[in-house]
Structures are given as C-alpha cells and as structure tokens.
Amino acid sequence: MGSNIYSEKNKLNNLTGSEWKFSTKSVINKVYPINMQHKLRSEHGGQKPPELCADLIKIFTKEGQNVLDPFMGVGGTLLGASLVNRNAVGIDLNSRWIDIYKEVCKLEGMEEQETICADSLVALDKFNNETFDFILTDVPYWNMDSLEKTRNKTVKQSKLNNFENNTEEQSKKEWLNLMKRILSKSVKKLKHGQYMAVFIGDMYRNSQYHCLSGELAMKLNEIKGITMKANIIWEDPSKSLHVFGYPAAFVPSMIHQNILIFRRD
C-alpha cells in the first residue's frame, strides 16, 4: 500500500494509504477548534465538533455520498458533511435544535442540508432502503433530560425525555429498546457493506458507573444484518477535570466518549 497514493481499488473512501493507516487509530485525541458558532450550538448539551464529524465521514464515505443522522441535534453531522462535500439528512423531534442548525448555516454562509422535524420512526419511512452510505449519530442519553451535574446547578438538555414514571432499571431498558428500534430502522436505509457510527458516553450517577456504551453495544448487536467492527475512543481535551470524590472516594472525570462502529452485512 503506497503511503501517499490513492488506490483505485478503494471502494470505501478517498483516503491515501497513509491517511487510511492513520484513520485506524482506536483513540482520537485531536484538539478540534471551538468554532462554527460553538456558543450557539452549546445550547444543546451533547453537540459534537463538526470537524470531528467531518473526519469520521471522510473515513467511511467518498465525496458526494449520502449521510444520515436520525438524532441530529444541532447538526454536527450535517455541518461535518458540508465541510467534506457530502450530502446529509438530519432528523430530530425538537424544532429548536433544527432552528439552531439553520442559524449556524446562515451565520457561517453554508448551504443547509436536508432536515426533518419528526420522530425518526416515522420520518425514516420517507426514504427507500439502501439510500445512505453512512450513518453517524449521537444517541440521546438515558435519564439525561434534566440531569443536574454534581455540585453544579447548570442543567443541560438532551434530545430524549425521561421515562419518569418507571424505576431506573425499567427506564434504562426502555431507552435501550427504543435506541434499538430507531437504529434498526435506520440500518435498513443503509447500503450493504457500509457503516454506522454511534456516539455514546458512559455515565457516573448515584455513586455508580454506568457503562452505557457496553450496554448499548450489546443491544445493537441484536439487530439482524449488522456486525460490530470497532469501538473508537474520542478523548475530548476541552473537558475539565473534577475532584467530586476527594478526599474520600475515587470518582472518574468523564473526558471521553465511545464511538461504536457497525457494518451492514
């Protein structure tokens, strides 16, 4: 494999051999710029750097191909797709997040990608099977709609309501089942041999570490026709370290997220 040569046999992306090799790192620790109306996009508690999304899109697609985000939030995936000349469709229940995405496009002088304000379980019916070349999404967290940070009164909103009338374990089970339903339907819109990447962070809550990434990976592995291929760790250098348990107990500072990679068979 020539280090700086693009192979015509490359059916996945536009990367050279050396770029492909670098993209296989299981940890992303690149410092991404705080730009593209970051303050405005930060109204959403789970926004991702558009350049990070662009880097992932470059790994799993070629220019001009189509990307789907069934939980678009404020449009990190869509902005990333625009940066690298891909087409994208984003779906979200919350019109506020879509409005923020559109305002960012206006302020940045970028053409808007297609957005749909609806339940993904309904909106996905609009598209034929095998329409998309890549799915990139950041799933809404279980129990994160109005979660107060420890020792901090700042409240961040996610894209999914709490299951407030159920017990904690019941609500987590419902969350996992809902994620499976939506992403299972999304996968049907993905071309065979193509990939889905899912952001998911773990959580420390009520003095317990919740390995949501592992639980979600196991649940998504139940979807017929896809195979898990990797777990990429994104280390976010912008996250602050904390001393929540000091001096009595160890409590981790959550400065990473997992990116679960699946391929449609």
Language-model features: locations:
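Class I S-adenosyl-L-methionine-dependent methyltransferase catalytic core
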Residues: M1-D265
